[in-house]
C-alpha cells in the first residue's frame, strides 16, 4: 500500500481542505497521514519555521511514508532547506525512496531533495488545488502514483 504524507512546509491548507485531501487519498486505496500543524498557528505560514520543520522531519523520518505531498505552496519552504541539509546524513538513511509532490514554493524542496537527498520529485498540483486539475492530468497523476506507465499526448 502506498503511504502519502500530507505536509505543509509553506502555507497551510485552510478550512476543510486537509480533510478533503485525506479523503481523496484514501478513496484511491492509499493510506493518508497528516503531518500538518494546527490551523492558525501562524499569521502567514502554516506554522512558525521551527514547527514546520519538525512536522516535515517527522514525515521524512517515518519509515512507512512513500510520498510527501504538499497541501499548498506559497512561501516558506525555502527557509527549511538549510535545516534539512544540516541533517543530510541522517535523512539519507531511509530504507526506501521518498517522492516529493507539489509546486510553487515547494520547488525549493524539489531542488534540494533531488540534488542532495536523493528524492524523486514530481512537479504536481498541491493537494489544495488538486480538485481544480483537469481530469486528464488528474488521471495521469493517479497512474503515476500507482506506478503505471504514464504517457501524455497533446490533443
Placement of each model-derived feature along the sequence:
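Hydrophobic structural segments
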Residues: 59, 80, 112-114, 120
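N-terminal glycine-rich "phosphate-gripper" loop used for MgATP/nucleotide binding
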Residues: 67-83, 103
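Fold-independent oxyanion-binding glycine-rich loops
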Residues: 9-10, 37, 71-73, 103-106, ...
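ATP/NTP phosphate-donor binding region
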Residues: 1-64
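Structural motif
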Residues: 4-5, 66-67, 99, 119-122
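Conserved anion/nucleotide-ligand pocket segment
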Residues: 118-155
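Short glycine-/acidic-enriched loop or helix-start segments at secondary-structure transitions
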Residues: 16, 77-81, 110-112, 133
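Short, acidic/small-residue loops that bind anionic groups at enzyme active sites
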Residues: 87-112, 120-127
Amino acid at each position: 500500500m502506498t503511504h502519502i504524507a500530507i505536509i505543509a512546509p509553506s502555507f497551510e491548507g485552510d478550512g476543510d481542505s486537509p480533510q478533503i485531501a485525506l479523503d481523496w487519498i484514501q478513496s484511491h486505496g492509499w493510506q493518508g497521514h497528516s503531518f500538518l500543524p494546527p490551523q492558525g498557528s501562524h499569521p502567514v505560514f502554516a506554522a512558525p519555521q521551527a514547527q514546520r520543520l519538525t512536522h516535515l522531519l517527522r514525515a521524512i523520518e517515518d519509515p512507512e511514508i512513500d510520498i510527501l505531498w504538499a497541501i499548498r505552496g506559497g512561501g516558506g519552504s525555502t527557509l527549511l532547506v538549510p535545516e534539512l541539509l544540516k541533517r543530510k546524513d541522517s535523512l539519507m538513511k531511509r530504507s526506501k525512496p521518498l517522492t516529493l509532490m507539489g509546486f510553487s514554493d515547494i520547488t525549493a524542496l524539489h531542488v534540494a531533495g533531488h540534488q542532495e537527498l536523493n528524492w524523486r520529485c514530481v512537479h504536481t498540483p498541491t493537494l489544495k488545488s488538486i480538485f481544480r486539475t483537469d481530469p486528464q492530468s488528474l488521471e495521469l497523476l493517479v497512474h503515476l502514483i500507482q506506478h503505471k506507465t504514464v504517457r501524455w499526448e497533446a490533443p
